[in-house]
A protein has these predicted regions:
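A generic structural signal for well-ordered alpha-helical segments
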Residues: 13-14, 75, 103, 135
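Short, solvent-exposed loop/turn elements at beta->coil junctions and helix N-caps
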Residues: 26-28
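Non-catalytic C-terminal accessory region of glycerolipid acyltransferases
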Residues: 30, 93-198
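Short acidic-hydrophobic, aromatic-tinged amphipathic segments that line or gate anion-handling sites
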Residues: 23, 81-84, 175
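Short gly/ser/thr-rich secondary-structure transition/capping motifs
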Residues: 16-24, 92-94, 148-150
């Protein structure tokens, strides 16, 4: 389901928006090891298309997104893990164990958006600490990804044509760093790349 939707998204972007999709840094993709993906988030594009770049990654998302017609069904279909953000609830008590179990029993990587919501192309909000908590609990490599999709498919306003979306796969961040150090490196690497892509 995820790959089909990702391929359809790529087709629509290429042929209806006359937009080129470039993937750079494929040599940095982690192979034969458990890892999770931390990607910048400017549009709905990456929610769908990254399913085709990586091996059908699993999303962590706000529980209310599952209530959106059709989109919520899609998120459930691809095995997303939902959480009530900023709350400690019974539903969230097994959060990290659910993720660890998923990573252990599957070849599918986890994907998170450290900005926590879609942002405009020139916005640079601080990354949320939830990203470092996942890094600390899972104790696996992080694959950073920078995507400048907001110029084509912005969170507000109409879509643009004759543009280029670049998906930049950055060098992995090894496990074992302190939480604050990891978050600082992740944020710096992704924003430096986005500044370059601009």
């Amino acid at each position: 389901g995820g790959r089909i939707m990702g391929n359809w998204t790529g087709f629509c972007v290429k042929y209806f928006l006359s937009t080129k999709i470039i993937i750079k840094g494929t040599e940095n993709i982690i192979k034969n090891k458990k890892f999770f993906i931390a990607a910048s988030h400017q549009s709905m594009f990456e929610t769908f298309y990254l399913q085709t770049v990586f091996n059908s990654p699993v999303f962590i998302l706000k529980k209310e997104l599952l209530l959106i017609p059709i989109f919520g069904w899609y998120l459930k279909k691809i095995g997303s893990i939902s959480i009530k953000r900023d709350k400690t609830t019974k539903d969230n008590l097994s959060f990290y164990s659910d993720i660890s179990k998923l990573i252990s029993n599957s070849n599918r990587p986890l994907i998170i958006f450290p900005q926590a919501t879609r942002v405009l192309p020139n916005e640079r909000p601080k990354f949320k600490k939830g990203a470092s908590k996942i890094y600390d609990n899972l104790k696996i490599i992080c694959q950073p990804v920078a995507i400048n999709s907001g110029y084509v498919w912005p969170k507000k306003g109409k879509k643009n044509i004759n543009k280029t979306i670049t998906i930049s796969i950055l060098k992995p961040i090894e496990a074992g760093l302190q939480n604050d150090e990891f978050l600082k490196i992740l944020e710096k690497n992704i924003y430096t790349e986005l500044d370059f892509l601009n």
